Amino acid sequence: MTKKLPSELKQTRKSIQTACEFCHTKHIQCDVGRPCQNCLKRNIGKFCRDKKRKSRKRIEKHGTQPYLNLGKRLVIHDVPSKTVSPSSVHLQRDFLSSDQEKPGKTPAHNTNIQYTYNINDNFQSAGSIPRITNFNTNNGQTVLENTSNNISASQAVHLMNDPIIPTVRKSTLNLKSHFLEQHKAMQQPLATNCLVATSNVPVHSGMDDSNKSDDDVDDETNIHFDSMWCNDEYMKLKDIVDISTPFLPNNSQIFSLQESEYPNPSASTRGNSSLHLTNLLNSTKSVNDQKDSSIGHSTSTFNTYDEVVSRPFISLDMLHLNRGANANTQPSHNAKLESECDSSSHSDADLEKHDTDFISPSKFRELVKTPQDLYDNKCLIKLHNYKLAYTKLLTTLRKKFLEGAEIDKSASVKDEHSTQKHNLRYDLEVIIRSILERYAPIFISLTSNMIEEDLLLQEVTLQRALLDLENMAKLVSCTPMCIWRRSGEICFVSNEFYSLTGFNKNLLLDRTSFIFEYLDHKSVSNYFQIFNELLAFGYNDINKRKKLLMLNACSSTSSKITEGFSFTTDGKAIFTKCNLLLSNGLYLKCACCWTVKRDSFNIPILVMGQFLPIFEMD
């Protein structure tokens, strides 16, 4: 049996309300004195002080306050007419008895009714309330109900917003479709009896039946989260995965624009005017400008959140320096494209004049010869102006395909000459269409988050990889090699390539020259289709991609993709054939290998081409 303690010892061991910090830490008995006996024994009496406890969060009791008349008010947070998530949403409703509505009286009890409904269910009207699953009171009772349609809609209904549950809005996963859907929603009339107080967007449950039938297909795949960061990440991931649905015009849209501008197909495709392709290429831009202007007037009534969700694009100051010059030179070049053959050369001269930061590859290599020189002279590395590069590329392609068709009059038969011009125009359309449909959507998705420092790092990575490739070409006797950027600008040419083609080194590296200038029309068309579809960003299923590329190949004889090309397992190289231009004006048939070099963002920065001549025996 435990010995009973004396009363003095019991009083000493009696627990106190607040212990000191030392006794609280050591879990020993403290006394009311300060300093306490434990601290005095250990000579730490000057540090003895009460332990501060965290204040408890006490639940405030509801006082007797008169209930305010809530009136006929329906508050709903992001509740669409049709939703796609299988989650559940909980509604909480406060019912007031008849005696509680009078001011000055305390309510007997509070009643909470919890509604649970499947988001896949469709609302028939704005006043419809989902099925009641349980009935909770303060006494702990639970009553199951079957329906709540007989409850008056005039009572206050509060939606408990769950930030995890996605809600549906009139938006799609890409920028242009998102704005077009918003513009379409603004044009649709909304019933006045369906206007409710919302936090973000109007509820579509009160639309006409015709409007609901039109939106059934759109709402099935349009998911919008309450968090703008989560929604932005979802859109970018969806764009990267779903690369088969670009937001730019597809084949049918381009040909529909062509038919709308040229009702007569023969007059549009076989006419003598070369402005047909220029108008066709600019038609998409004009239509988009008209839509953007109309959308800009209507989107002012939308919430400011819509502006935050808009897809970011890379916009640097150096890219805007050439805006005025390009705006002045472009219309004059398009107007004189057919009559003056020297208009493209004037345009190139104007672009070179305004490109003050341009350093030719030969001059840059004189300054930077080793990797250490690259980092010592890092100030010399500037952001490459790809906007200006693609402008020059478009001018080069127009000159090669359109003006080449006008100058080449060696055909003996007029019909044969007309067919040749038609095929060259069609080849240029195929090239531009492959860029818009295959390359541009994925490129925009990958670069939407890049900043100016990322672009500078990309240029440093390009120059560092270029040094390694040049050293490889100089150390060993390799096949004729040429290295160019993703825009086609030549960066390096090996000595074997000079010996094979007969061109001068200064002609290729002292100015902005493109690899497409030294390939024939068929090789250029094949390169763009293979690069945009397979080589630029890689591929998963080789056979599937190859079959898709064959099916998408045009029926033109000059632009039909050759069947003799193969791939590497890592998806970074393609083996095919091409016709290489020589200094005497003739073309040499070569077997070539195109190898791509990508950066950490999986964006192509360099393409290395190796050419091996094929000599046919008679």
From Swiss-Prot:
Source taxonomy: Eukaryota, Fungi, Dikarya, Ascomycota, Saccharomycotina
Entry keyword annotation includes rRNA processing: no
GO molecular function (one): zinc ion binding
Biological role stated in the UniProt entry: Transcription factor which regulates nonfermentable carbon utilization. Binds specifically to 5'-CGGN(8)CGG-3' and 5'-CGGN(9)CGG-3' sequences in the promoter region.
Protein name: Glucose starvation modulator protein 1
Segments of this protein annotated with the region Disordered: 325-353
Ranges for domain PAS: 466-538
PANTHER family: GLUCOSE STARVATION MODULATOR PROTEIN 1, ZN(II)2CYS6 TRANSCRIPTION FACTOR (EUROFUNG)-RELATED
Organism: Saccharomyces cerevisiae (strain JAY291)
InterPro entries: ERT1_acuK_gluconeogen_tf, PAS_13, Zn2-C6_fun-type_DNA-bd_sf, Zn2Cys6_DnaBD
Keyword Cell inner membrane: no
